């Protein structure tokens, strides 16, 4: 079984405008990436073409840099519902952007997120 352990599938609507523009400039295949971010089915087909069985989808809270709030956790929880055996969710908690770490962790668990990335302070 082949598992890609580091894929960023992100909510495009959360990107700060300047971060999104930079991504568009630096990624010649931006439209393909955007389609994968919008459509789990399209991303699963791409995994099939590449011979990848599963993918860990990593998001992270980074409001200052990219614009991502803790809403990325809900986004990825919803995204992986398309095929939870192949799409493995990795949520995020940023110590500087929470007032209650325990409550945020409990919410991540309620969403069914299977892994967590703790962004450094």
Spans of features found by a protein language model:
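An N-terminally biased module of ancient metal coordination in phosphate/nucleic-acid-related enzymes
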Residues: 1-60
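Active-site gating/metal-coordination segments in enzymes
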Residues: 53-54, 62-121
């Amino acid at each position: 079984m082949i598992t890609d352990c580091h894929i960023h599938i992100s909510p495009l609507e959360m990107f700060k405008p300047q971060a999104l523009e930079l991504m568009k400039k630096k990624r010649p295949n931006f439209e393909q990436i955007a389609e994968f971010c919008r459509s789990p089915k399209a991303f699963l087909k791409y995994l099939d073409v590449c011979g990848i069985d599963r993918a860990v989808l990593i998001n992270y809270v980074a409001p200052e840099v990219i614009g991502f709030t803790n809403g990325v956790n809900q986004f990825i929880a919803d995204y992986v519902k398309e095929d939870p055996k192949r799409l493995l969710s990795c949520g995020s908690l940023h110590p500087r952007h929470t007032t209650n770490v325990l409550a945020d962790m409990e919410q991540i668990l309620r969403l069914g997120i299977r892994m967590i990335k703790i962004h450094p302070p």
